[in-house]
Protein backbone atom coordinates (compact mmCIF):
# COMPACT_ATOMS: atom_id res chain seq x y z
CA UNK A 1 0.00 0.00 0.00
CA UNK A 2 1.54 3.30 -1.09
CA UNK A 3 0.48 5.12 2.11
CA UNK A 4 3.06 3.13 4.08
CA UNK A 5 5.92 3.79 1.66
CA UNK A 6 8.24 6.72 1.05
CA UNK A 7 9.51 5.33 -2.25
CA UNK A 8 7.76 7.81 -4.53
CA UNK A 9 8.10 11.57 -4.73
CA UNK A 10 6.55 13.69 -2.01
CA UNK A 11 4.33 15.43 -4.57
CA UNK A 12 3.02 12.15 -5.98
CA UNK A 13 2.41 10.83 -2.45
CA UNK A 14 0.50 13.98 -1.46
CA UNK A 15 -1.66 13.93 -4.58
CA UNK A 16 -2.50 10.23 -4.22
CA UNK A 17 -3.13 10.43 -0.48
CA UNK A 18 -5.33 13.51 -0.84
CA UNK A 19 -7.34 11.68 -3.51
CA UNK A 20 -7.76 8.70 -1.15
CA UNK A 21 -8.86 10.96 1.72
CA UNK A 22 -11.28 12.92 -0.45
CA UNK A 23 -12.76 9.88 -2.20
CA UNK A 24 -13.26 7.98 1.06
CA UNK A 25 -15.09 10.91 2.65
CA UNK A 26 -16.98 11.61 -0.56
CA UNK A 27 -18.10 8.01 -0.95
CA UNK A 28 -19.38 7.94 2.61
CA UNK A 29 -21.20 11.23 2.05
CA UNK A 30 -22.91 9.87 -1.06
CA UNK A 31 -23.88 6.63 0.71
CA UNK A 32 -25.36 8.50 3.68
CA UNK A 33 -27.19 10.86 1.35
CA UNK A 34 -28.65 8.00 -0.72
CA UNK A 35 -29.68 5.93 2.30
CA UNK A 36 -30.88 8.62 4.67
CA UNK A 37 -30.57 11.98 2.97
CA UNK A 38 -28.31 14.69 4.25
CA UNK A 39 -30.00 17.13 6.61
CA UNK A 40 -30.99 20.52 5.27
CA UNK A 41 -29.44 22.16 8.33
CA UNK A 42 -25.88 21.40 7.23
CA UNK A 43 -23.00 23.76 7.73
CA UNK A 44 -23.08 27.16 6.04
CA UNK A 45 -20.97 27.04 2.89
CA UNK A 46 -21.07 30.75 2.05
CA UNK A 47 -17.37 31.63 1.89
CA UNK A 48 -15.34 34.82 1.88
CA UNK A 49 -11.67 34.90 0.87
CA UNK A 50 -10.75 34.79 4.56
CA UNK A 51 -12.94 31.67 4.99
CA UNK A 52 -11.27 30.01 2.00
CA UNK A 53 -7.78 30.76 3.32
CA UNK A 54 -8.81 29.51 6.74
CA UNK A 55 -10.24 26.32 5.28
CA UNK A 56 -7.33 25.58 2.95
CA UNK A 57 -4.32 26.89 4.90
CA UNK A 58 -4.90 27.98 8.49
CA UNK A 59 -7.29 25.21 9.55
CA UNK A 60 -5.16 22.39 8.12
CA UNK A 61 -2.00 23.90 9.64
CA UNK A 62 -3.51 24.14 13.13
CA UNK A 63 -5.26 20.77 12.94
CA UNK A 64 -2.12 19.08 11.60
CA UNK A 65 -0.07 20.58 14.41
CA UNK A 66 -2.56 19.30 16.98
CA UNK A 67 -2.70 15.93 15.20
CA UNK A 68 1.09 15.57 15.34
CA UNK A 69 1.09 16.29 19.07
CA UNK A 70 -1.65 13.70 19.65
CA UNK A 71 0.18 11.12 17.52
CA UNK A 72 3.44 11.70 19.39
CA UNK A 73 1.55 11.14 22.65
CA UNK A 74 -0.13 7.98 21.31
CA UNK A 75 3.29 6.73 20.11
CA UNK A 76 4.36 6.50 23.76
CA UNK A 77 1.85 3.65 24.14
CA UNK A 78 1.96 1.90 20.75
CA UNK A 79 4.09 1.87 17.62
CA UNK A 80 1.28 0.56 15.40
CA UNK A 81 0.75 3.12 12.65
CA UNK A 82 -2.87 2.31 11.75
CA UNK A 83 -3.99 1.96 15.35
CA UNK A 84 -2.42 5.31 16.22
CA UNK A 85 -3.95 6.96 13.16
CA UNK A 86 -7.40 5.52 13.97
CA UNK A 87 -7.26 6.67 17.61
CA UNK A 88 -6.22 10.14 16.52
CA UNK A 89 -8.88 10.21 13.79
CA UNK A 90 -11.51 9.26 16.36
CA UNK A 91 -10.50 12.24 18.50
CA UNK A 92 -10.80 14.56 15.51
CA UNK A 93 -14.13 13.01 14.53
CA UNK A 94 -15.49 13.82 17.97
CA UNK A 95 -14.14 17.38 17.75
CA UNK A 96 -15.65 17.90 14.29
CA UNK A 97 -18.96 16.45 15.47
CA UNK A 98 -19.18 19.26 18.00
CA UNK A 99 -19.47 21.69 15.10
CA UNK A 100 -21.92 19.57 13.11
CA UNK A 101 -22.80 15.94 13.95
CA UNK A 102 -22.20 14.44 10.50
CA UNK A 103 -18.82 16.12 10.08
CA UNK A 104 -17.31 13.71 12.55
CA UNK A 105 -18.35 10.72 10.49
CA UNK A 106 -17.08 12.28 7.26
CA UNK A 107 -13.72 13.34 8.73
CA UNK A 108 -12.68 10.01 10.23
CA UNK A 109 -11.12 8.42 7.12
CA UNK A 110 -9.33 11.58 5.97
CA UNK A 111 -7.72 11.89 9.40
CA UNK A 112 -6.63 8.26 9.23
CA UNK A 113 -4.87 9.14 5.96
CA UNK A 114 -3.33 12.31 7.44
CA UNK A 115 -2.19 10.37 10.52
CA UNK A 116 -0.63 7.53 8.55
CA UNK A 117 1.14 10.01 6.28
CA UNK A 118 2.59 11.93 9.21
CA UNK A 119 3.90 8.78 10.87
CA UNK A 120 5.40 7.36 7.68
CA UNK A 121 7.13 10.58 6.64
CA UNK A 122 8.13 11.48 10.19
CA UNK A 123 10.74 8.75 9.77
CA UNK A 124 12.53 11.19 7.43
CA UNK A 125 12.08 14.03 9.92
CA UNK A 126 9.24 15.47 12.02
CA UNK A 127 9.23 18.57 9.80
CA UNK A 128 8.79 16.47 6.65
CA UNK A 129 6.05 14.43 8.35
CA UNK A 130 4.20 17.60 9.33
CA UNK A 131 4.60 19.14 5.87
CA UNK A 132 3.32 16.05 4.04
CA UNK A 133 0.31 15.65 6.36
CA UNK A 134 -0.45 19.38 6.09
CA UNK A 135 -0.29 19.34 2.28
CA UNK A 136 -2.58 16.32 2.06
CA UNK A 137 -5.04 18.02 4.43
CA UNK A 138 -4.89 21.32 2.52
CA UNK A 139 -5.45 19.54 -0.81
CA UNK A 140 -8.35 17.56 0.70
CA UNK A 141 -10.01 20.75 1.91
CA UNK A 142 -9.41 22.38 -1.48
CA UNK A 143 -11.24 19.54 -3.21
CA UNK A 144 -14.13 19.87 -0.76
CA UNK A 145 -14.36 23.60 -1.49
CA UNK A 146 -14.25 23.05 -5.25
CA UNK A 147 -17.01 20.43 -5.13
CA UNK A 148 -19.04 22.71 -2.86
CA UNK A 149 -18.66 25.61 -5.29
CA UNK A 150 -19.60 23.43 -8.26
CA UNK A 151 -22.69 22.22 -6.40
CA UNK A 152 -24.02 25.73 -5.79
For each feature predicted by the language model, list its residue ranges.
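Intrinsic low-complexity, intrinsically disordered segments enriched in polar/basic residues
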Residues: 1-10, 16, 118, 151-152
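Membrane-interface helix-loop junction between the first two transmembrane segments
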Residues: 31-43
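Transmembrane helix-loop-helix hairpins at the membrane interface
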Residues: 21-22, 26-29, 52-152
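Generic preference for well-ordered secondary structure
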Residues: 3, 11, 15, 45-49, ...
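Helix-boundary and loop/linker segments of multi-pass membrane transporters
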Residues: 2-7, 40-48, 77-79, 121-123
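N-terminal signal-anchor transmembrane alpha helix
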Residues: 8-33
Amino acid sequence: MFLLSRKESKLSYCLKASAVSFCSAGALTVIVDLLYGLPADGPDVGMTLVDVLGTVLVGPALETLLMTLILVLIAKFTDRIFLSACLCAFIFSVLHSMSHPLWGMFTFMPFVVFGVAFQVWRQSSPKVGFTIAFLIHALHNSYVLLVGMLGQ
